[in-house]
Amino acid sequence: MSSYANHQALAGLTLGKSTDYRDTYDASLLQGVPRSLNRDPLGLKADNLPFHGTDIWTLYELSWLNAKGLPQVAVGHVELDYTSVNLIESKSFKLYLNSFNQTRFNNWDEVRQTLERDLSTCAQGKISVALYRLDELEGQPIGHFNGTCIDDQDITIDNYEFTTDYLENATCGEKVVEETLVSHLLKSNCLITHQPDWGSIQIQYRGRQIDREKLLRYLVSFRHHNEFHEQCVERIFNDLLRFCQPEKLSVYARYTRRGGLDINPWRSNSDFVPSTTRLVRQ
């Protein structure tokens, strides 16, 4: 269990509780979780973070009524800056989006502006929102993470409790390499409900070579770990930076959707540009 799982800041969340579904607009449904909850135990300070990045959300179940009452549907793309005070709790996000269902808006841009305003207020940070008509995305190919997949190793694993022990002495040699490693075996659990979260992760770095077996064992150790998606990515970035000390590092995870939403956080200390094309499990 994470050290802050019972923090009072989490007590008021609707997550893990029975809730009513409202279908008329209600911005108060949105709930934020302070990023400091997981950053403080990691020694990360808001004014001196070792990374930049965003939390990329895809909204697959977004619908509202136009001015004449005709339902509209869209796919939304949201990017929340890493400097925001709060991350956005996903169940509250789903409930908030449901409140658009029977609400009339004059045009698409009004919907976009409403989302941008409310999400920014909840997160207390910079956010961007784009809405796409379905025909704009038809034929969009399934993407993949560029890099070398480390999953097909002939190793025995019998411990699934989170530990950084695998990263100790996990670099080999003095030669500086630049490579991108990928795993589809990332599985963690919701901080509150402990429901499984399934993801693929891309790790791009420049530095002494990281032992792939030790890295895979470390990633698999998240299997019983309870944290939100964004928190897991920041923990992985911080652990790799601390133990492996790469000159450059980027960590990007794309998680499978739940409740019509997928969350795809990335953190980097270089000029990393994430691909936003959905992966095969998304």
Swiss-Prot record:
What keywords does the record list, in alphabetical order? Cytoplasm, NADP, Oxidoreductase, Queuosine biosynthesis
UniProt GO molecular function: preQ1 synthase activity
One Gene Ontology cellular component: cytoplasm
Is Nucleotide-binding tagged as a keyword? no
Name the pathway: tRNA modification; tRNA-queuosine biosynthesis
The Gene Ontology biological process terms listed for this entry are: queuosine biosynthetic process; tRNA modification
Question: Which compartments does it reside in?
Answer: Cytoplasm
Self-association state and partner proteins as the record states? Homodimer.
Q: What is the designated name of this protein?
A: NADPH-dependent 7-cyano-7-deazaguanine reductase
Please report the organism this UniProt entry assigns to the protein: Shigella boydii serotype 18 (strain CDC 3083-94 / BS512)
Q: What is the lineage of its organism?
A: Bacteria, Pseudomonadati, Pseudomonadota, Gammaproteobacteria, Enterobacterales
